[in-house]
UniProtKB/Swiss-Prot annotation:
PROSITE patterns: THIOREDOXIN_2 (PS51352)
Domain Thioredoxin: 1-105
Protein known as: Thioredoxin-like protein YtpP
Gene: ytpP
Keyword line: Disulfide bond, Redox-active center
InterPro entries tied to this protein: Thioredoxin-like_sf, Thioredoxin_domain, Thioredoxin_H-type-like
PANTHER family registered for this protein in UniProt: THIOREDOXIN, THIOREDOXIN-1-RELATED
Pfam families membership: Thioredoxin (PF00085)
Up-regulation conditions: Up-regulated in response to depletion of tryptophan, phenylalanine, tyrosine, or availability of charged tRNATrp.
Disulfide bonds: C28-C31
């Protein structure tokens, strides 16, 4: 997973093919919960490029994109939002897998 460091990087990544943005924060226990199985998800869904977005560093983007809970996931394809899994609830591996499968089905 690539870490987004600037607004310019984020804007460029949004325009790529099949980008998954994970909004997270170091202090978030539910975000830490998903970390152990993220590499497996990345391997099982190679169609996507995965990006980590620090909620605290990109607080304005979170407001603009209506990211009000973390961890949250947003999928873009060629500059268009395809799907989102945004809530304050803890996400399971199975829920994220279903989200990624559903995102690809919207192609």
């Amino acid at each position: 997973m690539k870490k987004i460091e600037s607004t310019q990087e984020l804007e460029k990544a949004v325009k790529d093919d099949w980008s998954v943005f994970m909004f997270s924060a170091d202090w978030c226990p539910d975000c830490r919960f998903v970390e152990p199985f993220l590499p497996e998800l990345e391997a099982n869904f190679p169609e996507f490029t995965y990006y980590y977005v620090d909620r605290d560093k990109f607080i304005d983007t979170c407001a603009e994109w209506e990211i009000y809970g973390i961890p949250s996931f947003v999928v873009f394809n060629e500059g268009k939002e395809v799907n989102r899994f945004v809530s304050k609830d803890r996400k399971t591996k199975e829920e994220i897998e279903q989200f990624l499968t559903d995102s690809l089905a919207k192609a």
